[in-house]
Amino acid sequence: MALNLQKKEEIICKIHETATRAVSVVVATLDGIAVNEVTKLRKEARDIGVCVHVIRNTLMRKVIENTPLACLREILTGQNIVAFSMNQPRDSARIFVKFTKNHEHFKIKGAVFEGKFIPASKINLLSDLPNHKEAIFRLITIMKTSSIGSLIHILHILSNQKQ
């Protein structure tokens, strides 16, 4: 269905607003995926704060023009689905990686995080990022472990010196 100029401008405006608020963006191919599967993916994504859009490449190019997402221009070929993480940077990558495991035709093309392009081969780096609570827990664990380890080491040295 052909879109008139006003509809295209509305779509560009809406997606541009989403793109500017997103903390990360992931692009994947949509070839060979049934509509009901895409609907399930969208619902699952919406539940964790990820906006998923199927948008024409020409419109997407206009959306990313003069933004940190401009590095996606080269991979916008064919039929694509774009996920915008609104809360945690890993969410869009994680949901696409999970979807890829069950759908062999679904291929991740790349992502953008903090203005840098992440190729599909390194998408697991983004999907494996800890969320805020996990990062704080890991930091506290490291701090506790290192301080206890230092104390044990000092006590061991002192006990060796006394003997």
Swiss-Prot record:
Keyword Ribosomal protein: yes
One matching Pfam family: Ribosomal_L10
Gene Ontology molecular functions: large ribosomal subunit rRNA binding
UniProtKB keywords: Ribonucleoprotein, Ribosomal protein, RNA-binding, rRNA-binding
Family: Belongs to the universal ribosomal protein uL10 family.
HAMAP family per the UniProt record, alphabetical: Ribosomal_uL10
Function recorded in the entry: Forms part of the ribosomal stalk, playing a central role in the interaction of the ribosome with GTP-bound translation factors.
Protein name: Large ribosomal subunit protein uL10
